[in-house]
């Protein structure tokens, strides 16, 4: 377990916490440690990654570039935080490692905004 935010690089961020889904990077927030997944794994193999980082999914994926390109893990990422994630996340993942198949699933519970991108490589 790591007490750190998922991000593209190892750094410090300012995070404004809020009730439920209200957390976000904000200069007026509390200073928190941020880590990239590549840094945490330090080259170790990973077979599955789940991202749901309240709109920072692309930043977290950028911090997993080596792991994705080297090991092609199964990936599940939230898509409902930012409208453009429906396009940018699959394109970015595909740019890191060709051969992924992409699936979108809308969960059947209330509230109905739990839309996820599933990425499965053909290896």
Would you name each region that the model predicts?
Residues 1-123:
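Phosphate/nucleotide-binding beta-alpha loop and adjacent structural elements of enzyme active sites
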């Amino acid at each position: 377990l790591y007490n750190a935010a998922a991000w593209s690089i190892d750094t410090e961020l300012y995070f404004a916490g809020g009730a439920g889904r209200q957390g976000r990077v904000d200069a007026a927030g509390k200073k928190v440690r941020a880590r990239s997944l590549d840094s945490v794994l330090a080259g170790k193999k990973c077979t599955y990654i789940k991202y749901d980082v309240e709109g920072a999914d692309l930043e977290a994926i950028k911090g997993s570039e080596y792991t994705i390109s080297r090991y092609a893990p199964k990936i599940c990422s939230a898509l409902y935080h930012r409208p453009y994630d429906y396009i940018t996340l699959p394109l970015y993942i595909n740019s890191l490692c060709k051969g992924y198949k992409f699936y979108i699933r809308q969960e059947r519970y209330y509230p109905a905004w739990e839309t996820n991108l599933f990425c499965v490589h053909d290896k």
